[in-house]
Amino acid sequence: MSSDSSSAKSAPSTSIEKSSVNDLHPEIDLERVPRHVAIIMDGNGRWAVSRGLERNAGHREGIESVREIIRACRDYGVECLTLYAFSIENWNRPKGEVSELMRLLEEYLETELAEVMEHRAQVRSIGRLDRLPPSTRRAVEHAVEKTADNDGMKLVFALSYGGRAEIVDAARRLARDAELGKIDAEGLDEKGFASYLYASDIPDPDLLIRTGAEQRISNFLLWQIAYAELHMSQRMWPEFRRGEFEAAVLDYQRRERRFGLTSEQVSSGSARSSSANESDS
């Protein structure tokens, strides 16, 4: 996911469908909706255990939140939504839970593909997908291929994903190209390095949401969230629905995004420096 200098999109590029204007929150400025929202969907298991249910019940209920948040993003004109669906560390969970998560993913992709196509959303995937079970990988690849030509919202699933692993994989590809003489390592800059990341054509997240009442980023999009606004929700993921999403967007719109500039520079309309090494003071 490449660096992008826009702090908020100038106008929604995806149409507002399945929702009337009256359904939208009156305080949300549609001209300043984040272009790219990334979500760490945490708390499924804890939500279930707190209700005396098995952890997998939380994952099943979490699917409803996925559906609702995708529709909310579409309604508000978000251009890209990245969902942290399965981390590379999640392979260490009990085998039964992992198997159920894979089954739910396959089922979701199969049942939701018609709606995805209806709204011309484009499914993408990032992560070490070679570790997925064959049937799961086929389901993911089918959804990606089926929607490749769609021009609506990008829906990115982070699967078998880790931020450090992504950077390592990028470094390996870069090293191979340097060895073959395809690039000049001495002339490499941050933009050049970012082009080796999993989805370098997608702009960096503007807003990172984490549910589950935790205060950490859990190895998610480590390179890309350098200037993202962070919203930590106390809600477990199965409880995070449209209203909570709208609250996160309102929180985002109250922030002043400086990208290393002063407030005075931002107010005067100074352009953000393209350097990702600048610190936000």
Model-derived features: positions:
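Flexible, compositionally biased loop and terminal segments
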Residues: 1-281
